[in-house]
Amino acid sequence: AQHMPKEFTPGFAEHLASATGLDVVEGYHGMALSPGQVVIAPGGVDSQIRRPFENHFALDVRKHDKSPIHPSADLLFQSSARACESPIAVVLTGMGDDGSKGAADYAQRNYPVLVQEPATCVVDGMPGSAIASGAVSEVLEVSQIARQLKRWCGEHQRPQTQLIKTN
């Protein structure tokens, strides 16, 4: 859930696809989610993951009143914590506290929450809030987050998690 206006998310998806060689697309309402595909939440609306039936996931895209920010990382994390068996949350640079409530849902289910090291952020509000919530399993630099995701996704197994202690 990249906080970005709707005019910019298609180009952002194209840029990421070109830069990474991955299958990166902008999501849309009702889209079937496929393994190995990276989906960018469209700007100005919220994206949630639903599980219409066993082993099938779809994107529910609409604006919700629950959040002042669209797309909302909290709503995305909360829905994926309910719908998925082994989701991984990642909180990167950004202002405000979006993502910290969803991270708490992950922590309650013992799902991993990776957070960008605040010292490496352009704006450390979102990572700082997630850390302060006590719901974070690892605080890493972006390159370390990428390596961890590749390792976990390549292994196709649920990562073992443990909350880090915060002061």
Please state what every model-predicted region is.
Residues A1-N167:
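Conserved acid/base catalytic micro-environments in cytosolic active-site loops
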